[in-house]
Amino acid sequence: MWLKDPDKIYSIINKVQSVLDIPLTVKMRTGWSDPSLAVENALAAEAAGVSALAMHGRTREQMYTGHADLETLHKVAQALTKIPFIANGDIRTVQDAKQRIEEVGADAVMIGRAAMGNPYLFNQINHYFETGEILPDLTFEDKMKIAYEHLKRLIDLKGEHIAVREFRGLAPHYLRGTSGAAKLRGAISQASTLAEIEELIQLKA
């Protein structure tokens, strides 16, 4: 409910900032039910001493419905003059990131759900801003190699049993937009071992 109270935002951040010896960054949404306080909330965070502010372009009530409110994000970007502003929400492509920087006026972008099944997106965006070149999307084979590496690292971290169960929930993101994905997704959802998944995606260590 603090999204309805800029003074509360200032108070909370100021108290946290006062006991830290490291930079404090904050992420918030455009508001609770509407974005009318987005700029005021952002300025309260800036005044309280945050080192950077990230804002997701939806209200708390919207959750992930609708579209990111780029107009409100632009207003916030224009209002903040002392700290970097990081735009978040609906950044799925290099073009989306480019728009947030060039049109919204953000200093940086933050990517969440779009990175699930496509961690390569970070590389594409970094490469574009460093060179001006847009790298091609990954092939299915390359996506499966990354998915396999993801699974192997999960196994190293959590053990095979837990990792495979978690990977069953991640696989649909890697398969999104792939021809015949439903059948493969269904098969992976039944797998219980690394060997079974290796067989399904035809990769070996």
What kind of feature is each model-predicted range?
Residues 1, 29-30, 61, 85-86:
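A generic structural signal for short
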Residues 7, 11-14, 19-21, 35-52, ...:
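Alpha/beta catalytic cores of nucleotide-metabolism and tRNA/nucleoside-modifying enzymes
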Residues 26-38:
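Active-site mouth loops of central-metabolism enzymes
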